[in-house]
């Protein structure tokens, strides 16, 4: 079976390897063109006034899967087409999504300023990580990526970084400045570096129980 798997991987394109979490060549022509196009479109989006209807056209060209979401901008996607954003979800200023593997954001997700979703992974040993020249002289390196999933009805506060391979369950609140390196179960309040669950979110947190806020 292992030999069969190796043969399958050999027949995969570099894009297929990348979104499957396999080691891939980031200097691949198709991937380079996709990134350059996404970066160009992000630059276009970021200079448009937030009232300009052209922003919607730019996001459509970027290939983000989903509708009825709002990105305040500036934004930066590595590809865009490997990201799915649910209904009524929102990202505040300076949203970064390095979507080398699929990024899935659920419905009604609030993301504060400077949120970063980072799927790329690099080898730990520098001997495996450093750049090298291919036979044609092009510089490349060995990279892989892990997907990120954020469930429905989450609040990801400002300056949060979510690392590759993480799933955040429905109804979670991730405190400001957290670095999320492991899965967070549904309906959790989690915070810290690395991010840890502080407690569950319960009916006691209902605004009805906090009249002092009104």
Identify the meaning behind each predicted range.
Residues 75-85, 90-166, 193-194, 200-210:
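Flexible, glycine/small-residue-enriched loop-and-beta-strand segment within the central core
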Residues 59, 71-77:
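Arg/Lys-rich RNA-binding interfaces used to dock onto structured RNA substrates
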Residues 61, 83-85, 184:
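Short, T/G/N/S-enriched strand-turn elements that build extracellular solenoid repeat scaffolds
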Residues 1-67, 124-127, 195-214:
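Terminal amphipathic alpha-helical/low-complexity segments used for targeting or macromolecular assembly
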Residues 162-191, 195:
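C-terminal/domain-terminus segments
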Residues 15-16, 61, 140, 146-147, ...:
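Short secondary-structure boundary/capping segments
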Residues 67, 107, 152, 170-171, ...:
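Short acidic capping loops at alpha-helix termini that bridge into adjacent secondary structure
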């Amino acid at each position: 079976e292992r030999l069969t798997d190796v043969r399958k991987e050999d027949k995969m394109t570099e894009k297929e390897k990348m979104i499957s979490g396999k080691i891939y060549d980031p200097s691949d022509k198709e991937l380079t063109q996709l990134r350059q196009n996404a970066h160009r479109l992000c630059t276009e989006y970021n200079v448009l006034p937030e009232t300009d209807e052209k922003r919607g056209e730019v996001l459509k060209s970027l290939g983000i899967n989903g509708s009825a979401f709002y990105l305040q901008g500036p934004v930066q996607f590595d590809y865009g087409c490997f990201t799915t954003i649910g209904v009524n979800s929102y990202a505040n200023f300076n949203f970064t999504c390095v979507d080398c593997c699929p990024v899935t954001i659920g419905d009604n997700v609030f993301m504060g300023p400077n949120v970063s979703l980072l799927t790329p992974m690099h080898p730990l040993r520098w001997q495996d990580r450093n750049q090298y020249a291919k036979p044609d002289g092009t510089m490349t390196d060995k990279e892989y990526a892990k997907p990120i999933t954020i469930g429905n009805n989450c609040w990801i506060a400002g300056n949060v970084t979510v690392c590759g391979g993480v799933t955040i369950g429905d109804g979670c609140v991730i405190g400001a400045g957290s670095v999320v390196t492991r899965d967070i179960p549904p309906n959790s309040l989690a915070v810290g570096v690395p991010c840890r669950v502080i407690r569950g979110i319960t009916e006691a947190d209902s605004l009805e129980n906090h009249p002092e806020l009104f």
